[in-house]
C-alpha cells in the first residue's frame, strides 16, 4: 500500500513512526497540620479519581483519533489512581492538513478525525514532606501514537484539564518509515519546539525552558507558573489568618519547592 505525506512523499506501506508524548503536571499546596494534609489528599483523590481521569483520556483519544479497545482503571488505597487505554493500531483513513503544523491542537468538541493508534495511560502520585508543610500532587500522562497524527495535538486539551503549577513535557519520535524508493524517514513533520503546540494565552502564564536534541528527535519543555499568590497554595483558609512572618516563611518554602521541581535539583540540604 502507498501513502502520501503532506510533503508529497509517497510511503512504502503504512507510516511506522512511533510518536510519544509524556505530560507531567504538579500541584503544590501548603498543609501545616496532619488534618490539613489528609483533607488535601482526600480532595485531590476525589478531584482526580479514576472516573474523571477516564473521561480526560477518552477526550484525548478522540483528539488523536484513536479507537478504544479496552479501558483498565483503578483507584488505589490509601490514595492515587491509574487508567490505561488500549487502542487499536491501523491504517490512516483520513489525515487533516493541520496534523503536520506546529500549532495548538483542538478541544474535544472540534474533533472529527477517525484514526487508529496504540496506547494512552495516566497515573497519579500524591505525596507530602515528612516534617514540613508541603504536599504535592503529580499526574503523569503518556500518549503514544503510531502513524501520521502527532500526540502533541492533545497537549492543549491536557493543559486545560489540570490546575497545574508546574509542567514537564517530553516528546520523541522513534522508528522509521520508508518511501517507495526505500529511503528511511525518521520524522515526518517539522518541529522546533513543543511550545509551538501551546496557545499564547497559556504560554503567558508560565516561565518556559526548552532542552531539545534535534538530531535525535527529542524535545523537552518545562513550565513554571509566573505569578505567585499565596492564597492559591493554602488549603481551607486564606493568608489573612497568618501573620506577616508566617506568610513570608510559607511563601519561601513553597517557592523553594517549586524551584527544586522546575530545575530538577535540591537547593536546601
Swiss-Prot record:
Active site per UniProt: 118, 123, 146
PTM annotation (Pyruvic acid (Ser)): residues: 118
EC number(s) reported in the record: 4.1.1.50
Molecular function terms from GO: adenosylmethionine decarboxylase activity
Cofactor: pyruvate
Site for Cleavage (non-hydrolytic), residues: 117-118
GO biological process: spermidine biosynthetic process
Pathway the protein contributes to: Amine and polyamine biosynthesis; S-adenosylmethioninamine biosynthesis; S-adenosylmethioninamine from S-adenosyl-L-methionine: step 1/1
Enzyme class: lyase
A family per Pfam: AdoMet_dc
Highest taxon of the lineage: Bacteria
Record's GO cellular component terms: cytosol
Record's comment on post-translational modification: Is synthesized initially as an inactive proenzyme. Formation of the active enzyme involves a self-maturation process in which the active site pyruvoyl group is generated from an internal serine residue via an autocatalytic post-translational modification. Two non-identical subunits are generated from the proenzyme in this reaction, and the pyruvate is formed at the N-terminus of the alpha chain, which is derived from the carboxyl end of the proenzyme.
The record's free-text note on cofactor binding: Binds 1 pyruvoyl group covalently per subunit.
Enzymatic reactions: S-adenosyl-L-methionine + H(+) = S-adenosyl 3-(methylsulfanyl)propylamine + CO2
UniProt keyword terms in alphabetical order: Autocatalytic cleavage, Decarboxylase, Lyase, Polyamine biosynthesis, Pyruvate, S-adenosyl-L-methionine, Schiff base, Spermidine biosynthesis, Zymogen
Family annotation (PANTHER family): S-ADENOSYLMETHIONINE DECARBOXYLASE PROENZYME
Family of this protein: Belongs to the prokaryotic AdoMetDC family. Type 2 subfamily.
Assembly behavior: Heterooctamer of four alpha and four beta chains arranged as a tetramer of alpha/beta heterodimers.
Function description: Catalyzes the decarboxylation of S-adenosylmethionine to S-adenosylmethioninamine (dcAdoMet), the propylamine donor required for the synthesis of the polyamines spermine and spermidine from the diamine putrescine.
The protein's name: S-adenosylmethionine decarboxylase proenzyme
Organism, scientific name: Brevibacillus brevis (strain 47 / JCM 6285 / NBRC 100599)
Gene that specifies this protein: speD
Amino acid at each position: 500500500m502507498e501513502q502520501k505525506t503532506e510533503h508529497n512523499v509517497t510511503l512504502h506501506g503504512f507510516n511506522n513512526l512511533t510518536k510519544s508524548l509524556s505530560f507531567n503536571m504538579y500541584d503544590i499546596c501548603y498543609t501545616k497540620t496532619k488534618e490539613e494534609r489528609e483533607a488535601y489528599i482526600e480532595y485531590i483523590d476525589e478531584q482526580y479519581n479514576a472516573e474523571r481521569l477516564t473521561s480526560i483520556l477518552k477526550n484525548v483519544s478522540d483528539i488523536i483519533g484513536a479507537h478504544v479497545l479496552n479501558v483498565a482503571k483503578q483507584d488505589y488505597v490509601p490514595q492515587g489512581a491509574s487508567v490505561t487505554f488500549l487502542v487499536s493500531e491501523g491504517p490512516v483513513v483520513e489525515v487533516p492538513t493541520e496534523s503536520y503544523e506546529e500549532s495548538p491542537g483542538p478541544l474535544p468538541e472540534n474533533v472529527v478525525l477517525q484514526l487508529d493508534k496504540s496506547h494512552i495511560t495516566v497515573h497519579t502520585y500524591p505525596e507530602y514532606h515528612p516534617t514540613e508543610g508541603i504536599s504535592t500532587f503529580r499526574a503523569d500522562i503518556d500518549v503514544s501514537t503510531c502513524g501520521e497524527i502527532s500526540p502533541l495535538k492533545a497537549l492543549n486539551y491536557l493543559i486545560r484539564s489540570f490546575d497545574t503549577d508546574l509542567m514537564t513535557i517530553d516528546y520523541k519520535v522513534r522508528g522509521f518509515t520508508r518511501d517507495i524508493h526505500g529511503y528511511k524517514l525518521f520524522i515526518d513533520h517539522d518541529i522546533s519546539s513543543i511550545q509551538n503546540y501551546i496557545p499564547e494565552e497559556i504560554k503567558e502564564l508560565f516561565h518556559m525552558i526548552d532542552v531539545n536534541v534535534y538530531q535525535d528527535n527529542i524535545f523537552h519543555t518545562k513550565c513554571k507558573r509566573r505569578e505567585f499568590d499565596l492564597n492559591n497554595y493554602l488549603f481551607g483558609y486564606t493568608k489573612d489568618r497568618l501573620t506577616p512572618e508566617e506568610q513570608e516563611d510559607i511563601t519561601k518554602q513553597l517557592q523553594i519547592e517549586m524551584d527544586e521541581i522546575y530545575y530538577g535539583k535540591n537547593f536546601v540540604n
